[in-house]
Amino acid sequence: MGRKIIYSILFFIITILIIILLIYGYFKIIGLESRVPEKKENLYSIRTEKYLDRKVFIVTPNEGKTSDEVILYLHGGAYVGEIEMEHWEFIGQLITDIGATVILPDYPLAPKYRYTDTFKMVEPLYKEIVDKVGAEKLTVMGDSAGGGMSLALVEKISTETNYKIPSKTILISPWLDVRLTNSEIEKVEKYDKQLNKETLKLAGLAYAGEDGINNYLVNPIDGDISKLK
């Protein structure tokens, strides 16, 4: 009971600190649902569907190159930030270049939700996509925190389920260790104009929740990659 009380107090403090950081601009948007950009409809079509009480954006090309490839894209944002315009720009470029369908889940965000809540959405979504199109046509892709989540998802699929892993897993500057234990971080942090080690630690703790910070789904650097390709 004592440990649970300590955890509850700790995560209450973390939540307050993240809100303060939000006010001072460290995180643009926190825990809010993502919105569809208004000026992109001429480039691609966006269909919004409800999935387990969350939104999933299904993005397809309006013209030009098309393919039967599907990309499950998990956006970055330190596990607390919503889908940004930069993500939409990148997805638009993907669609233009390869003509794939991009499935973009608006997954649950910390500090309101934990990694367990997030995986309750993204894992069944992955399985549903595989059931519909096959793993051989699926790419799992993500940037930053979404890159870490992408690797963790594929590790989980490969070790804890009978589902096939995707044909490709593409990680863009993935956040693989929310504990930030790499000693090289100290050397490069002063050159980083956007990210701050201490605020990232708070975000990582909020995402990890009471299960602690050492689960491979939070730190996919600790996961089993032997079956990945």
Predicted regions and their residues:
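N-terminal Sec-pathway targeting helices
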Residues: 1-18
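Alpha/beta-hydrolase superfamily serine-hydrolase fold, recognizing
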Residues: 18-25, 36-229
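Short Lys/Arg-enriched alpha/beta "domain-start" segment
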Residues: 28-32
